[in-house]
Amino acid sequence: MKLWAGRFSKEADKKTNDFNSSIKTDSRMFNEDIDGSIAHASMLAAKGIISEEDCKKILAGLSDIRNDIISGELMIDPDTEDIHTFIEGELTSRIGDAGKRLHTGRSRNDQVAVDIRLYLKKDVPQVTGLINGLIDALDGKAKEYAHCIMPGYTHLQRAQPITFAAHIGAYIEMLRRDLGRFEDAAGRMNYSPLGSGALAGTTYPIDRAMTAKALGFDGYMPNTLDGVSDRDFCLELLGACSILMVHISRLCEEIIMWCSWEFKFAELDDAFSTGSSIMPQKKNPDLAELARGKAGRVIGDLCGLLTTMKGLPLAYNKDMQEDKDAIFDGMDTVKMCLTALTPMIATMKMIPENMRKAAAGGFINATDCADFLVSKGLPFRDAYKATGELVALCIKSGTTLEELPIDEYKSICPLFDEGVYDAINLENCVTRRGM
């Protein structure tokens, strides 16, 4: 069945059909396509555009088709152009002419646009639920190792002492903002394009508010060209997916480092690690590495769809068929990563003694040493210089600030006294900063 037959005197070449088809991508929207058609048919009957009898046949036929697809009794034909064509063709074959009346006052342009919004309306809560699950896993890990001291880094150099809870808390805050981005995008997306027609609405006396309400939208899109021709809602969700995956990638990068012998701050559970085919000693953080890699894939989905949309004139263009490949892949990848990483993090064991040992090295308390001199009245820049000289002295003599005799301190600046040792104690450094 071709929805656009009549104008053409030849059958489309098989290569044309194959290239034009989107059934492999959009078949997942069969439920949403049926939901949209039920709302549309019910509205047509309520407005007297089709008969109640035809409407009843349409609704019953669509319900049967849905049940048969779900049960596996009806297989979606992979040679059909798209899911919309398949369902309408199947409906017409079952109920006859009544099925041909379903598309009255509707175009595939607004049909596709409402289907994808309906699908994503259901998909977004799945993603936000998984984000909340990852937040819970991170929060549990932060509480488990709340008082574990570790180095804080800048430029991947040891900078100042912090707690593990503070470090993980940064990712929790990032993920909470990610939640907000998905929720905001879902709110802006929640308006129905149904009734926009091909681009200029329809001459039939349809009720767009009725179908919008029936489908759970907050309202309908007032400009019909906008309704069928923009995919900013897909772009916005892909933007949220991309930022989320950047945060996930950064977290995974740190987990990968922490699990290395060079850091040895953490160890992943065997159930969430892999080995090597040749090196018996290896325990690889493959899940974290894969998630880090998949961040590029999701960012690519966003860049691809942005590039597709940037040069399109109003209204609908076939280029926009690429929207579903991008948004479905982006959302699917995000869900897959969150599903895999949450239990990996929940079962991850930290190694506090190694973290504490690392925090004790690298003169990580030098800023606190300088602040001690400031508390004695020395200007910060002078205190900074004096502490830098102390660090150089320690490096030359192979000692630490904690081990350096007070006489050596006083040789650099006479304002030093025994209180400096309390000031540079790691626990005190962390406590004073409220970390």
Which residues does each PLM region occupy?
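Short runs of predominantly hydrophobic/aromatic residues within well-ordered alpha helices
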Residues: 37, 84, 88, 234-237, ...
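A helix-coil-helix interface module used to build multimeric assemblies
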Residues: 1-201, 206-213, 274-275, 286, ...
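Positions in alpha-helical segments
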Residues: 39-42, 118, 122, 235-239, ...
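A local structural micro-motif
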Residues: 52-53, 150, 183, 220, ...
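Glycine-rich cofactor/substrate-binding loops
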Residues: 1-36, 97-98, 279-435
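Charged, flexible cofactor/metal-binding loops and thiol motifs
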Residues: 121, 143, 151, 157-311, ...
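Generic, well-ordered alpha-helical scaffold segments in large soluble proteins
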Residues: 40, 61, 65-68, 90, ...
